[in-house]
Amino acid sequence: MIGFVKQKELLDLLEENSENTKCYFEEVKNKNEDYIYVRRIEDASIPADNTNFFIYNRIEITVYSKTVLKRTNLCRYINSVFDTVFSFARANDIYTATCTVNLKVDEWNASP
């Protein structure tokens, strides 16, 4: 889904980072410095190394265009839900979970 959001609404959304909603926000490392908002929808557990690990098997990703936000009070965004499996790595006591998803942006430059 592609849509638009007012600048104030976006800033309010990005300031919310409640543990209860399991929503996370971080800057995407691309040349446009867009923003990504990730929401965990469902959990599933898988056994690994005789321990149960939780993976996010369904996530919702919304990407907000920072470039448009700078020019106008509207910000373009694209939203999609993914079913994905995370891979895990461990370094000492630090665990990381990663996954790769492809979000196709056909109409990113559409007008509001």
Where are these regions (language model features)?
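Short, conserved charged micro-motifs
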Residues: 68-74, 110
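Short beta-strand and beta-hairpin "edge-sheet" elements
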Residues: 73-88
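Short, charged/polar, Gly/Pro-enriched secondary-structure boundary elements
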Residues: 43-47, 105-110
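Small/polar-rich, solvent-exposed N-terminal microdomains that initiate assembly or binding
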Residues: 1-47, 51, 66
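Viral virion structural and adsorption modules
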Residues: 1, 5, 106-112
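Short proline/glycine-enriched turn/loop segments at secondary-structure junctions
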Residues: 49-50, 88-91
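Short proline/glycine- and acidic-rich turn/helix-capping motifs at secondary-structure junctions
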Residues: 29-32, 90-102
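Oligomerization/assembly interface segments of phage tail-like spikes and tubes
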Residues: 55-66, 95-108
